[in-house]
């Protein structure tokens, strides 16, 4: 009996020991699995830190490193236009230049990004014209929002509507004051935004370009042009909702130019992109000081928008032994109302309900109107310009309707009427012989 009990005790003890050993082995396996899981998690976290982030949406294509120190973005603007001229024959039944046409107004891929956190870049070619052009190509160092340095080819900080992105302008073509503004130039610019955007400034030195001109890649002048702009939005971010989008400023440029290579505009253009003023020939050249001054401002509140600017362009010119100081001026006022109630802004309209007819959504509609005037200095005639082919003043008014199907696609139609004043009756078959009447349409993709 005692032997049987002893045998049973030994068997129980052995079973307990085996169970303990199994528990220990199981515990060891659990620890190994837990450690493996920790290692897998650490590896996944490390991989996530090094994995680029790629996003595609209505703001284009973007790829960024996990720490966002390196960013590449692809955007684009495509504008397909039509111009239809009316009453484009004079009283002698002679054609007055204007051609009804479809055109690819802009076809611009926009490459931009950031390297090493503080260095931004932008490169913008345009395939919309008869030849490929480089419109923007610059590098920007961003020490802070209020202190940045830009170098390369970019817009000169003078014209308010000129500085507005092409995809956001109210009409197919910018107003008459743009004819007296510099366009793009090569140079250096110190700029920034102070107080969360309540004050912005820009001051730069450039090769120097004539009115409405882009720079070439080479400069034939020893002189430089200085340009600057200060723009305030004093109520931005405050509780005064009605004044948050009030902005006003002053811009200008000063330079000294002594050749026609960069000094004088080849011509001033109407809304329909027809020349209404030209200097007589290549013997008229820029010959000295050239300065511009432009007070400007805008106001947006709810669906209402208003933009206005005035510009003086003063240029010393010469034809042979004859010299003069010509001062041309221009101004414009443009207003808009979003009929569907969305907010208007300097950067366009975003529909509350993008176009989706199955859901009875139709996007946003905006009614726009503009009046503009450009006055040529009387001293330009008849020595520097021919009064038989060039007008001394152009007055233009326009109305239009913009349809924002969604944030990326927009269609618009507008009508423009430009009348001319001159020192004598225009010659037959010239643009200035009677008012220009033109209807524009556009289909735009911007992302």
Can you describe what each PLM-predicted range is?
Residues 40-54, 82-149, 158-166, 211-221, ...:
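Surface-exposed loop and membrane-interface regions of Gram-negative outer-membrane beta-barrel proteins
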Residues 90-95, 133, 144-231, 235-240, ...:
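Surface-exposed coil loops of outer-membrane beta-barrel proteins
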